[in-house]
Amino acid sequence: FVCRHFIDRDMHKLAGLGLSYELDTSALLEQKGFCRHWTELATCNTGDSFLTELTDIEGDVVDMEAYAQAFVCTSKEIPFISVKFVSDVIGQNSVKHWEDKLADARTGLSHFFNVLKESI
């Protein structure tokens, strides 16, 4: 997944206080002319907890850090995307799957960036 839209599920709980919990980095990427050939849009849902069961969350993938990274980059006007490799399925022994899938993630992401490098 190539994510340009980010939701912080912890901040979402505070939305009634006027705090922002969603970011979309597409406009800055387009303005700078980056990633034009990536047409698929993916949403990353970020939070401080490791999810072990499926809950009502928005997004295509879940992590624990991308919203903060996107927030800092956006505030500094630095283009940001997050490339995600799905290492586990929520509710299906996620901790064990995550440990087992690290080598697969390394291989998959290496392939992704090698293909990207060749297309530039």
Please name every model-derived segment.
Residues F1-I120:
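Glycine-rich phosphate- or other oxyanion-binding loops that anchor nucleotides, phosphorylated ligands
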